[in-house]
Amino acid sequence: MKLPIFIADAFTVTAFHGNPAAVCLLESILQEDAHQQIAREMNLSETAFIRKLQPTDSFSQSSCFGLRWFTPVSEVPLCGHATMASAAVLFHKIKNVNSTLTFVTLSGELKARRAEDGIVLDFPLYPTFPQDFHEVKDLIKAAIGDTTVQDIQYSPDTRKLLVRLSDSYDRSFLESLKVNTEPLPGIEKTGKVKGLILTVKGESGGQTTPYDFYSRYFAPWVGVPEDPVTGSAHTVLSSYWSQQLGKKEMRAFQCSCRGGELDISLRPDGRVDMKGGAAVVLEGMLTA
């Protein structure tokens, strides 16, 4: 087995920032268990597999492909940064001639289009609903201790729990917050929660780039203690903060140690555009 493989850093224009994802190009159907074996070998938060939908398709000429994502332990239904990485590989390395690519995925058809200063992902927008604190208090206590919480929301479509911290906290507090993810899968094992979003309101003005909101994302349930920059979490965050701020256009920053930023635009059709950069940092051949 020989497969072209790449690593691209998504939601950044600078190598070694953003969120790295491995991208495999599949000329033909891959044995099912090989997807997970390769993802485990790559040991990144996600490995993406792009496959041709028809034998006559071409990675440089076709505009529609199949796409799957795997963490080191399981397949996931949606991954933003690995979709961004996949589009970057096709656009920048394979020199795909199309301006827009369509990916057929477990979350339906997702589109990625070229932009002058990056790549725009067309993703679903998922609503949130108020979550009873007492149902998740043990989970939150284990994760962030006595940190003051302002709001708790739940996204049933993505099984993500959104925890908004007090507006008295700023970006530096969120960045330095020690989050204990190890016990979380043992505390919440009903399957209701598969990801924890922590978020704070942004600041305007000042000497630094203004962001509308900041976040961090944790998914120990699928083998990812903390994800550097998470497109799928922003399908939830965009819905929540748009309602809170009364805005359709927002800029977001994910406060992991690598960091990454997204330009967000809520669309009239109920979906969300997320724009970011990507840097391909490795290309080679997987042999097994």
Swiss-Prot record:
Active site annotation, chain numbering: 46
GO molecular function, one term: isomerase activity
EC number: 5.1.-.-
Gene3D superfamilies per UniProt: Diaminopimelate Epimerase, Chain A, domain 1
Top-level taxon in the UniProt lineage: Eukaryota
GO biological process: biosynthetic process; maintenance of gastrointestinal epithelium; negative regulation of transforming growth factor beta receptor signaling pathway
Keyword Isomerase: yes
Assigned keywords, A-Z: Isomerase
Entry GO terms, CC: cytoplasm
Subunit annotation: Interacts with UNRIP/MAWD.
Cross-referenced NCBIfam families: PhzF_family
Family under the similarity heading: Belongs to the PhzF family.
Name assigned to this protein: Phenazine biosynthesis-like domain-containing protein
Source species taxonomy: Eukaryota, Metazoa, Chordata, Craniata, Vertebrata
